[in-house]
């Protein structure tokens, strides 16, 4: 078995990239590269053919790369053993080394017949059994067979969870609203009581189903919110038995679930080889099923499985997740880009960037290697974004004319679910999608800006004073991803595409992308502070800042 990887910056392939960057790479100009190569788009784009959902296009030609850069990046992927790491994940090896766990969210969407082994046990029978349980329950609720404590049909579903138990289902139910089956979906995550209170104002206790999503059924925020929701239900129903009609659990803790009042037959389980931020494919996706129906949930799984197969079987140079990952490494580790923008030109995808903030930053926001050594190179970027065209009127100014390099992914569907005004809205949206990547690449030179101002009637000092402000340097890198339509299948494929991109980058950086110890310290300290908020006495047990904050808050309770 191959030994541990050397630090990335000591890897010969990395050093060759650094040498090329220093000598030529930093000066690559995307606009010039297009002038020199008429076939650049066909060379640096990829079309993935699906059976029923059209093609998925990845255009990565508007990047600061040429053949030399690309060959060096691929060489880096090979020496970092990306292919072997990929195979280890799919084969059920315990690649989450700090928790000694397999990483097999891909098994949840395995639509084939091959076994998937974890510790020599095929997990697929259990996966299929849980899916069958989800299907049965989903159909009962949507059809009206399952009813509330007063006999009324369920109209609203409230998912109570946090982190991966909230962000994924929320993003997907929003993205797939056109496929909704009529139930109204609500999500409560924040321990701030306002979140729950505002949702409860909108629903009727007789027709509301609560989903409590917590593997251990001990997550503080989730159980606190669930307990308050139960209190609200009982205040209205006056019947303890009503809990079983209005609450189900996504958990593996049967004792805690039944103690809460939920019938254990309405408990949906998952496994320790499913990480929270990769769990929407599991029982955590029950709220998705109830929103769009189980058949559409299966299409979501199918799309992810399609991308899994592409990632697993395609050579690195034509592998979409690998391509995105390598481009990210190029900008993060050589151009020192600190952020990456996800910019979907589809309103239904308005939570996509927020979802992958967790997916990327919780996975690759690490400063030590798998061997526990502090790394001396950049790892995970800050991920952010908003839907177009809203972002254009907010932060694109900085992307176009700011001092920081911000690589961007633009995502758009060729077809809209809402072709209102004869499709006019969507044509305007797409024209902006297309124009932005062109503008970021080409920019506007001094001469072009001068000619434009002259044509507008400016001259002399007035022109000279305004001229520098009208110049766009350009050469801003972008990827464009186009799907035929946002469907359950294409959304599943998009999510899996980014999941695998994150995985590949983690392998190259030699970090564990599947733990999240960074969330623990704050929670530990919060437990120590919470009892200090049970009384009005001043505290002096912390640093002066924390003491001052606690005492100021207490003083303002009066």
From Swiss-Prot:
Report the InterPro entries cross-referenced here: G6P_Isomerase, G6P_Isomerase_C, Phosphoglucose_isomerase_CS, SIS_dom_sf, SIS_PGI_1, SIS_PGI_2
**GO BP annotation list:** canonical glycolysis; fructose 6-phosphate metabolic process; gluconeogenesis; glucose 6-phosphate metabolic process; glucose homeostasis
GO CC, one annotated term: cytosol
Class of this enzyme: isomerase
Where the protein is mainly located, per its record?
cytoplasm
Q: Where exactly are the transmembrane stretches of this chain? A: none
Q: Where in the cell is it found?
A: Cytoplasm
Q: Which pathway?
A: Carbohydrate degradation; glycolysis; D-glyceraldehyde 3-phosphate and glycerone phosphate from D-glucose: step 2/4
Q: Which UniProt keywords apply?
A: Cytoplasm, Gluconeogenesis, Glycolysis, Isomerase
So what does this thing catalyse? alpha-D-glucose 6-phosphate = beta-D-fructose 6-phosphate
What's one Pfam family here?
Answer: PGI
EC number(s) on record? 5.3.1.9
Molecular-function GO terms, alphabetical: carbohydrate derivative binding; glucose-6-phosphate isomerase activity; monosaccharide binding
Q: Which PROSITE patterns match?
A: P_GLUCOSE_ISOMERASE_1 (PS00765), P_GLUCOSE_ISOMERASE_2 (PS00174), P_GLUCOSE_ISOMERASE_3 (PS51463)
Record: active site: 362 (proton donor), 393, 523
Give the record's family classification: Belongs to the GPI family.
Q: What is this protein called?
A: Glucose-6-phosphate isomerase
* Encoding gene, per UniProt annotation: Pgi
